[in-house]
Amino acid sequence: MDMNRVKQIVSSPADIPVYYNGVSVWIDGYDEENQMATVHLRDGRLNERRDVPVAELEEKGEAAH
């Protein structure tokens, strides 16, 4: 995934499926300068946030870019 798509997903009202290492995640925010995104698991564990490289995020489904 690229940073422009991350920005679109974060600002979108739609529920867009995003995966990190095959696990469904929410994107909480991003660091454009370092090309990193802050994510947490979609299962609700908000306390398990981590920063991951944007390039390692994948979008799946009909809206994939």
From Swiss-Prot:
Describe how expression is induced or repressed. Expressed only in the forespore compartment of sporulating cells.
The answer to whether the entry has keyword Nucleotide-binding is: no
Q: Which UniProt keywords apply?
A: Sporulation
Quote the Pfam families the UniProt record gives: SspH
Give compartment(s).
Spore core
Its domain of life reads Bacteria
The Gene Ontology CC terms held by the record are: endospore-forming forespore
Organism of this sequence? Geobacillus thermodenitrificans (strain NG80-2)
Instruction: Spell out the InterPro entries in the cross-references.
Output: SASP_SspH
Gene responsible for this protein: sspH3
Q: What are the recorded Gene Ontology BP terms?
A: asexual sporulation; sporulation resulting in formation of a cellular spore
Membrane-spanning intervals of the chain: none
Entry similarity comment: Belongs to the SspH family.
Name it.
Answer: Small, acid-soluble spore protein H 3
